[in-house]
Design a protein with these regions (language model features):
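Conserved AAA+ ATPase small/helical "lid" subdomain
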Residues: 183, 190-248
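Alpha-helix initiation and N-capping motif
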Residues: 69, 179, 234-238, 256
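C-terminal engagement/docking regions of AAA+ P-loop ATPases
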Residues: 54, 237-268
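AAA+ P-loop NTPase catalytic core and its hallmark functional loops
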Residues: 1-198, 202, 261-268
Length: 268
């Protein structure tokens, strides 16, 4: 076994509950070697979905958390200087292309546009990655796939993908699960009882209803899970909700008070 491949494999099945036909669609996209774009709010399950699909498809997964300081060299690689001279070190995108991994660029709109254009040759019929500094063109492994994600709610004129980038991908829309399904996910993920899980989800729904009315983003499923984990460790439900589900999403005193009242009503 190639240790470079094995270190990126998902050892155990990640828990993921499909919301629709996204699993079947991704399997078809992978079979066709199509790049995939996942769109949805923060903490709705995009990253967990990618982990699950990597496990289901039996492929290694290399994840890159994109940020505004990321350069093209951070993705493709660079020369390093050591006591033996200079040596080339592949970046995560190049490594994935060589070994046939799924490369997941998380929150790609956070990266500069002049950085993300390096993925273009990998996302059309060429499936190649030019390493200009090395004078090499890497032909992607037949099993390689590129997956990107971003939150459309954070789009702006300054942070958005170019149309020339968007039109290279098959796109899946994600959102927070329906309340019953979300409660099931929270209970399965944490071991919390079904009644408490349902109450936590009800609070999350109340926060999401404030999006656009003082909140830029509602409470994510991830934060609901955090609250459940605190409750399981002996924290009172109201305190757990304030700590994990309200305080992280707003500093506005009026909105905090509104959500604190919702907590008191739900956990009366």
């Amino acid at each position: 076994m190639n240790p470079d491949i094995e270190q990126y494999r998902i050892a155990r099945e990640p828990f993921y509950r499909p919301q629709g036909d996204e699993v079947v669609l991704h399997e078809a996209a992978y079979a066709a070697r199509l790049p995939v774009m996942l769109k949805g709010p923060t903490g709705c399950g995009k990253s967990r979905f990618v982990e699950y699909m990597a496990w289901k498809l039996g492929r290694p997964l290399i994840t890159v958390a994109c940020n505004e300081d990321m350069t093209a060299s951070d993705l493709v690689g660079r020369y390093l200087l050591d006591r033996d001279g200079t040596r080339w070190l592949d970046g995560p995108l190049t490594t994935a292309a060589r070994i046939g991994a799924i490369c997941y660029l998380d929150e790609i709109v956070e990266a500069r546009q002049d950085t993300t254009v390096v993925i273009h040759p990998l996302t059309d019929h060429r499936r190649t990655l030019p390493l200009d500094k090395k004078g090499e063109v890497v032909a992607a492994h037949p099993d390689f796939q590129l997956v990107i994600s971003y939150n459309p709610g954070y789009q702006s004129l300054m942070k958005d993908l170019k149309p020339s980038t968007k039109q290279r991908f098959a796109a899946f829309d994600f959102d927070y699960p329906e309340p019953a399904l979300e409660a099931e996910i929270v209970a399965r993920e944490t071991g919390i009882d079904a009644d408490t899980a349902a109450r936590l989800v009800k609070l999350a729904q109340a926060a999401r209803n404030l999006k656009g009315h003082g909140l830029s983003e509602g409470t994510s499923t991830r934060l609901v899970v955090y609250a459940a984990q605190l409750i399981l460790r002996g924290i009172a439900p109201r305190a757990a909700c304030r700590t994990a589900m309200v305080r992280p999403i707003t500093d506005d005193a009026d909105i905090r008070e509104t959500l604190d009242h919702a907590i008191d009503a739900i956990f009366a």
